[in-house]
Amino acid sequence: MAAGNVNPFNVSDSEEEAEQRQDGADTERSPSDEAQGHSLGPFSPPAYSDPAALLSSNRTSPSVDGIPASAAAVSGIGAETRVSLDAIAAQLLRDQYILTALELHTELLEAGRELPRLRDYFSNPGNFERQSGTPPACKEQGVGPGGPLNRAGSISTLDSLDFARYSDDGNRESDERVAVLEFELRKAKETIQALRANLTQAAECEIASQERKNYKSSPETQEPIRPLEKRALNFLVNEYLLKNEYKLTSITFSDENDDQDFELWDDVGLNIPKPPDLLQLYRNCGNSQPLHRDTVDVAVSVDPSDLPADYFTQEPVQQTDVIQQQQQQEVVQELEYQISLLNSEKQSLAEQIKKLQSDIQALQRNVSSELTAGVKSIQSKENPKCDKPPLDNGQYLDIRGVTETDSSSDTTKTSTSTTIATDCTENSTTATQPHSKLKANGQQSKSSVQFDQPNRKLSPAFHQALLSFCRMSADSRLGSEVSRIADSEQSVMLMLGRCLPHIVPNVLLAKREELIPLILCTACLHPEPKERDQLLHILFNLIKRPDDEQRQMILTGCVAFAQHVGPTRVEAELLPQCWEQINHKYPERRLLVAEACGALAPYLPKEIRSSLVLSMLQQMLADDKADMVREAVVKSLGVIMGYIDDPDKYSQGFELMLLSLGDPSERVVSATHQVFIPAFAAWCTELGNLQSQLIPSLLTRIEKLLKQGEYGLDEHKLHMYLSALQSLIPSLFAVLLQNAPFTSRVKLQGDVPPIEVTRFPRPASPLQDVATIVGSREQLAVLLHLYDHQLQHEGTTGWDSLLWVVNQFLPQIIDIVGRINVTSSTCVHEFSRFFWRLCRTFGKIFTNTKVKPQFQEILRLSEENVDATAGNGILTKATVPIYATGVLTCYNQEEDRKLLVGFLEDVMTTLSLSHAPLDSLKASFVELGANPAYHELLLTVLWYGVVHTSALVRCTAARMFELLVKGVNETLVAQRVVPALITLSSDPEISVRISTIPAFGTIMETVTQKELLERVKMQLASFLEDPQYQDQHSLHMEIIKTFGRVGPNAEPRFRDEFVLPHLHKLALCNNQQTVESKRIDIATQLFEAYSALSCCFISEELMVNHFLPGLRCLRTDMEQLSPEHEVILSSMIKECEIKVENKGIGEAQGSISIAASLVGEDAKTKFLSKMGQLTTSGAMLANVFQRKK
């Protein structure tokens, strides 16, 4: 950059960029450095605010190529006489004259000439953040002009100035704004003086450099605390006390430090960034990276003053890049080292193969025939006991390959058999080596590992899905290390070499799972039982409260240990550790025990599986208070059920299933359905107990519940048993397929059509998938094809499992359905879901030929039985809604929908003509109406009733509209519902017209379209005002009942203009009623309606003109007919009169529930006490009592 004619106050952006590019050759910086240039100085302005280029690449020296900035400025002023304020502000900010710029900003604000540059700078808190590290030289020399300033409250003052200036509150007077601005300006000036005082105090409190060096020379001596540090620590300590509820201690602490404001961090000092709280500082004390200065070798005795000037100003990003590069280089070196090891192993193995081949030939010629036969027998084994694969690649038992042993390639077998003789030969030649005892011990233990295989017939897919619930993980680097166990001391050394680099930097940071491979290897190979027990104790107590990932690592290690040492040592060494932790105070440790029981189940002796482990889990399920522990217990019990083969344990398994289903935690019940029940059902299938014991036991318990529930059914237990039956449906269907007559003809062929996606309901877990139970999706496709063909063409002769379902199971469950309470929507819904899943699982052919005929035989919907009410009693039971919603809705084709419509029409007709209760039809409409897909279908059924010739059927259709309106969208209400109701409201039969009133009321309650509301309002008005209805007692009863039900939730205008005036008229007319029975009926309904409406907002005019007069008329009736009601009415009238007299209180409390005073004096006192707590203004108080819409 040319220095002679530079005007620092008049340089364009483009010129600035060009000059920066020219100067960039001297001090080249990376993009990351430029991005963080912001942090070089605590007050350096943001990049967008620089009007000119930096005068030098060194930001701390305001000179241009050796020419001082002042000279450049003078030459610029001489060349251009007028300088803009913005350029002056930019120069002040660039030279770090922050206080001067602050005073200029204040002066300009007072003059009304605010600079956007200064406003943006001083309103940005990021410009006032302190650097993380301050060079010692700066500390010793004091704070210079560009040094950091102690932050005070002036920033908020400037922000408030800006807020006041741009306030849009037009109601304030100009003098008020002037007063506010003067106050803020005065506050800003006081803050400026306080800043200067803080700077002076900070400079005076600095310790002399010689004294500081004396402290540094003695490591035992600590520097005296500085005032700034004391204030910061005081603030953090007080904050900790408040967060942890030590309020009295905090108050005492604040009193003892009355010179400090603990409410505001800025009181500690200007430009001091707030550190984390004490707890975070304590947790991070071991994680903090040492400062760059601390890395200087002490032996060299480097003094900070001797370091280069830019030593402490290097960007943190450069340090990070260096660290990352070093780490990457270490990784590359480690990989190269491993590659070299593998190459050397490859060469050595090739030489060994050649040597072995020659040795084998020599042995065959020279040794005896007995030894030769022994070697051949060893070679002939598919899985040799003394094989010795390559040191680092094959000396491990990998739990990830346990389920894939059948898929080993011929190449692997060949290479394994090739190395057998070498291993045996080496064993004979290494007997004199120092560690031969350890090696022989390891090989002996490996060769003797055999596990008890249960006598079970689970499909591989089901077995693998069951084991997936054992929470093990070998996907990560550490998981792969844990899942492999070394066989010899040489492999241990290799593992130590891999694991120690990860352990050393992490063990102090709660990364203790890195120790698991070392602990397991040592525990496997150590010859002393006490030491092994101690190591396993350390493993289970390694982490105080292990999280999910840490528990998975420990479990993976336990499984690898079990695979290596065998069932005897697992029982003797691992199980005692689990037993010790079973009552641990931390739930995470108990959770580890519960998960370990399931993970170790395949590697335990079968006697232990079915006795000790089962008892441990049963105790934890019954006693543990943590939901997550019981959930893990249930999953482990499911795994145990996949391995248990003792038939005597069936009853214990059944009790465990009931105990799990009755657990109060939803997550435990969910785990029971997902894991335990499918596994238990698979065992019952092998025992032959699924159809003979398990399902009949659940049905018996349901029947017992129904017998005991005459005075109240335990719906929770009914749901528990029925949900268990529902979870058993896939297993039951799998039994049918596996025991079918066509099983001998099953062949996997390519021409079998694939299974439709919607063929089966979505399973709750993989264990409930029929394909998993059977073995594979291809095999299931073949079985389904033969199953449908058998049902459709060949019949069920000899198919015992299917005949049991058709002849025993279905009749019993249908009989149970007929005995449940139809008014219980929960029971109806549960049984509907059960039949829906049953029919979807067993298929459409089974549903049409086996399920529907049994329901149709029971319901008997023929016209001949219309008058025989005794024969149609079943139509009033829950059988109707469950058949309609659980069976007829399984398949959604056109013929299925027609069948459903016809059934509902027949039920509606039969019930209406038989004068039977409509509860079963209502339950059907409620259950189907919850699904919008059936709204059109239900409307079709109701229209059939609207146009029916019988008035009874039309009455039923009118009442069904009330149930349907709430769930139907307003378009259907306008197009289908309202026209049908209008048609019925003009019916010749008065009973049909009366039946439409509840539906009209529900429309007024739920619909928002004004046109619809007006049509309904006109129809209701015709009922009330038409002379032909004046003596219709039933109509008046229905209208009053409807008003009381929908009035509180209806549109306010409808309530005020229609409901309250007509209730007043009805009450007045009831005073002239001569028939006492009718009068008491109307009066009772009016009392209920007025009690419901008293909780609504009622204006003073309505209160005087309609509400109070109606109450007085009603009181007149109650004085003669019901004195106890008259007392309540008198209290209501008195309170309303008080409200009318006191208008102010009436406006504030217009929506107070009048009925609150009727509940009792206690409720009234509580309500008034709440009112007394309100300290808001009248406008806000009015919002509390909003009009209810």
Swiss-Prot record:
Principal localisation: other
Coiled coil: 172-205, 326-373
UniProt repeat feature HEAT, residue ranges: 574-612, 613-652, 977-1015
Cellular compartment(s): Recycling endosome; Golgi apparatus, trans-Golgi network
GO CC field: recycling endosome; trans-Golgi network
Keywords: Coiled coil, Endosome, Golgi apparatus, Lipid transport, Repeat, Transport
LisH domain location: 229-261
Biological process per Gene Ontology, one example term: intracellular cholesterol transport
Comp. bias (Polar residues): 124-134, 426-453
Stretches with biased composition (Low complexity): 404-425
Biased composition (Basic and acidic residues): 19-36
Keyword Coiled coil: yes
Residue numbers spanned by region Disordered: 1-65, 123-154, 374-453
PANTHER family referenced in this protein's UniProt entry, alphabetically: RAB11-BINDING PROTEIN RELCH
Function field: May regulate intracellular cholesterol transport.
Protein name: RAB11-binding protein RELCH homolog
Organism: Danio rerio
Gene: relch
